């Protein structure tokens, strides 16, 4: 049974295993920031590699869920950003999950090519080590940047 009444995120915390809520009711309860955004973390579904952090508005999240392809909100361009639209480096959605506070969404994806606009496999290639920042990943060969 899918529950449809207005809810708070505390209802989800207290819900027993297998409880289901209408998506619109949950989206209405999320603490979208003042710009109407929520943090979105993309993770490779089979390896667990964290690929990137981006932002989603409700429209981007809805499009991602409907199309099965990651769509984000570009804060700099102020428009929807369909990941891989220009580069071909798409993220096929396997599953979406909300964190306990409802202020972040985890996208388990199948990444096609590099995830980072620099051509690297992920956006976390600057390691903070021993008081310095060290670049730990090179761009992949034949990568087309995603802008």
UniProtKB/Swiss-Prot annotation:
Domain of life, source organism: Bacteria
The alphabetized UniProt keywords are:
Amino-acid biosynthesis, Cytoplasm, Histidine biosynthesis, Hydrolase, Magnesium, Metal-binding, Zinc
Cofactor(s) annotated in UniProt: Mg(2+); Zn(2+)
Task: Give this protein's Gene Ontology molecular function annotations.
Answer: magnesium ion binding; phosphoribosyl-AMP cyclohydrolase activity; zinc ion binding
Q: What is its EC number?
A: 3.5.4.19
What is one GO cellular-component annotation here? cytoplasm
* Residues that bind Zn(2+): 100, 116, 123
Does the UniProt entry include the keyword Isomerase?
no
* UniProt similarity note: Belongs to the PRA-CH family.
What does the annotation say about its assembly with partners? Homodimer.
What is the recorded name of this protein?
Phosphoribosyl-AMP cyclohydrolase 2
Organism listed in the record: Pseudomonas fluorescens (strain ATCC BAA-477 / NRRL B-23932 / Pf-5)
């Amino acid at each position: 049974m899918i529950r449809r009444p207005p809810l708070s995120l505390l209802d989800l915390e207290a819900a027993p295993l297998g409880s289901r809520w209408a998506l619109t009711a949950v989206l209405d309860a999320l603490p979208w920031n003042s710009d109407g955004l929520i943090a979105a973390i993309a993770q490779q579904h089979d390896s667990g590699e964290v690929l990137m952090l981006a932002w989603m508005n409700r429209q981007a999240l809805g499009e991602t869920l409907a199309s099965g392809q990651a769509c984000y909100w570009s804060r700099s361009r102020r428009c929807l950003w369909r990941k891989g639209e220009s580069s071909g480096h798409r993220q096929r959605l396997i599953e979406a999950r909300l964190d306990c506070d409802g202020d972040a969404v985890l996208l388990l994806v199948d990444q096609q090519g590099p995830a980072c606009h620099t051509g690297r496999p992920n956006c976390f290639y600057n390691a903070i080590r021993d008081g310095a920042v060290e670049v730990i990943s090179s761009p992949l060969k034949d990568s087309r940047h995603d802008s």
